[in-house]
């Protein structure tokens, strides 16, 4: 299969639909027989990871399968479990695979999105499957970059902004944000919109139509209010120092 970030909508839908739905949980198990319990867990749970302590076992595996085994074990005194999802179709990305990027705690990035060099993803930001983000772009706190969105280089996506994704309907065109665009806090860019190079989207704007390059748009729905001038450039300047690793 091609990389997920290169799949068309129908292929992405098929991938999500056909992916095994998993609920991976971590269990802390108090037991009077850690070695024996660990051995039995490994025998009965093929994909589980088991770690043994002096009087406990830690198990990471499919929730329902682990519970079934633990409930059948007399050596288990009690257990505590941790999980943050249910029937997950697409896992989160392995953040260690991204190079030359900064991902702050609490950011959520799904499997195999594309992040360019120097990308910064702030706390609470969400980047969905199939999205592509160019070099030097910052995704600020609680912003959402939807499925298949294409974001260029040196873009700033403001806090709480939403770049709409396009899996439903599958015929919809993805959002395209060209290079050097600044998107203000809580702005919304709807499906199929292209924002031209160097444009500025004001805070709170709802963009329903394409934005020409080097224009400022504002309002609901967003309308062109002026050209990007020196004053606007000064107010929306991208700071390279914030993208240093």
Curated annotation (Swiss-Prot):
Q: Is Cytoplasm given among the entry's keywords?
A: no
Sorted UniProt keywords: Acyltransferase, Amino-acid biosynthesis, Diaminopimelate biosynthesis, Lysine biosynthesis, Repeat, Transferase
Entry's Gene3D superfamilies?
Hexapeptide repeat proteins, Malonyl-CoA ACP transacylase, ACP-binding
Q: What is the top EC class of this enzyme, as a single word?
A: transferase
Q: Does the keyword Acyltransferase apply?
A: yes
Q: Which InterPro entries match?
A: DapH, DapH_N, Hexapep, Hexapep_transf_CS, Trans_hexapeptide_repeat, Trimer_LpxA-like_sf
The protein's annotated pathway: Amino-acid biosynthesis; L-lysine biosynthesis via DAP pathway; LL-2,6-diaminopimelate from (S)-tetrahydrodipicolinate (acetylase route): step 1/3
> Which Enzyme Commission number(s) are on file for it?
2.3.1.89
Q: Which reaction does it catalyse?
A: (S)-2,3,4,5-tetrahydrodipicolinate + acetyl-CoA + H2O = L-2-acetamido-6-oxoheptanedioate + CoA
- CDD domains noted in UniProt: LbH_THP_succinylT (cd03350)
Gene Ontology BP term (one): lysine biosynthetic process via diaminopimelate
Which terms in the Gene Ontology molecular function aspect does this entry carry? tetrahydrodipicolinate N-acetyltransferase activity
Database matches in PROSITE patterns: HEXAPEP_TRANSFERASES
Q: What does this protein do?
A: Catalyzes the transfer of an acetyl group from acetyl-CoA to tetrahydrodipicolinate.
**Which protein family is it in?**
Belongs to the transferase hexapeptide repeat family. DapH subfamily.
Name listed for the protein in its UniProt record: 2,3,4,5-tetrahydropyridine-2,6-dicarboxylate N-acetyltransferase
Q: What organism is recorded for this protein? A: Methanopyrus kandleri (strain AV19 / DSM 6324 / JCM 9639 / NBRC 100938)
């Amino acid at each position: 299969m091609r990389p997920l970030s290169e799949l068309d909508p129908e292929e992405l839908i098929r991938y999500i639909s056909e992916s095994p739905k998993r609920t991976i949980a971590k269990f802390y198990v108090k037991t009077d027989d850690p070695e024996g319990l660990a051995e039995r867990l490994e025998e009965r749970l093929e994909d589980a990871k088991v770690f043994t302590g002096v009087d406990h076992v830690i198990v990471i595996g499919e929730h329902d399968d682990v519970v079934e085994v633990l409930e059948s074990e007399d050596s288990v005194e009690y257990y505590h479990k941790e999980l943050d999802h249910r029937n997950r179709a697409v896992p989160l990305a392995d953040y260690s695979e991204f190079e030359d990027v900064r991902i702050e705690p609490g950011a959520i990035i799904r499997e195999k999105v594309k992040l360019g060099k120097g990308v910064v993803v702030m706390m609470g930001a969400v980047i969905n499957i199939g999205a592509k983000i160019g070099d030097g772009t910052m995704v600020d706190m609680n912003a959402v970059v939807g499925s298949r969105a294409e974001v260029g280089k040196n873009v700033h996506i403001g806090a709480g902004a939403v770049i709409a994704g396009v899996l439903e309907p599958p015929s919809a065109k993805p959002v395209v944000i060209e290079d050097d665009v600044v998107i203000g806090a809580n702005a919304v860019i709807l499906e199929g919109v292209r924002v031209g190079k160097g444009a500025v989207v004001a805070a709170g704007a709802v963009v329903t139509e394409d934005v020409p390059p080097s224009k400022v748009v504002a309002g609901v729905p967003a309308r062109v209010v002026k050209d990007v001038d020196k004053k606007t450039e000064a107010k929306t300047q991208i700071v390279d120092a914030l993208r240093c690793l």
